[in-house]
Amino acid sequence: AFVQFKGFTLGQAWSTFGDMTAVPTTIDEEGPSSGIEIRQPMLRYTYHINDRWQSSLALEYAKASYTTGKNAESIRQKVPDIPLNIRYTMKNGSHVQVGAILRNIGYKNVVKDKDKIRTGWGVMGSGKLNITSSTSFLFQAEYGKGIANYIQDISGIGYDLIPTADDNGNLKAPGMWGLFGAFQHNWNPKLYSTITYSYARLEARGSLEGDTYKYAQYAGANLLWNFTEFGTTGIEYVFGRRNNFNHDYGNASRINAMIQYRF
């Protein structure tokens, strides 16, 4: 929950680093593997420059998720994440957005008995382009170091910081990136489809095991029907492939179905 007043947002809301209006509609709750879809406590200010431009700056409390190894320990995070973005909205309702984030992630080096900070950072670009009155293209790409918490597929599993290869108590912020693209087509006022492809990648594993996540691909297609003003039903096919650093991989296919009624 959050409250808004004169451009300020206080409470738990979607991260300022992301762009939820560029995320494609899926039945799958997780959505694209590279999506930036996280809600966190924040204080945000949004400034409407004019009818076309707006910008936001925030302080957000994010739970760092890192792997300590044998010679490091987790500590309480003292510095909030600082994301910002700027958006341009076109006359036809299309928009593009760019954003950046700065993180200071604290941990304890047990060998040196000293608290340390690693700086994480990230940049992103996203948008929704209305190609015709019934077809839109949605996209997003991001790159950074120490921003695993923000990337859907690797959020919360210990990749914001990882032990260095020598595991001497130092942690590093590995590079990571992702992208997705999706077409959404309205067949008529009540029937629509989305086709999505997404890719997410971790660039280094430090001293983590060989079965650590390296990259994954995600693809899906659906057909949704708004059978009333408040009701939606649909069916969806999703395919996923994960590759590890040791070259092991796995594929999975799934059929999702949904009936939703909004009160």
Task: State where each predicted segment sits.
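Outer-membrane beta-barrel architecture
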Residues: 2, 44-46, 85-87, 124-128, ...
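Detector for outer-membrane/organellar transmembrane beta-barrel domains
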Residues: 89-207, 212-213
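Outer membrane beta-barrel
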Residues: 1-65, 78, 83, 87-91, ...
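Residues that define the transmembrane beta-barrel architecture of outer-membrane proteins
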Residues: 37-41, 78-82, 117-123, 173-177, ...
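Surface-exposed loop and membrane-interface regions of Gram-negative outer-membrane beta-barrel proteins
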Residues: 1-4, 17-31, 68-72, 107-115, ...
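Outer-membrane beta-barrel "beta-signal"
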Residues: 225-227, 250-263
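Transmembrane beta-strands of outer-membrane beta-barrel pores
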Residues: 7, 12-16, 59-65, 90, ...
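Repeated loop/turn-to-beta-strand initiation elements of outer-membrane beta-barrel proteins
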Residues: 6-10, 51-57, 93-97, 134-137, ...
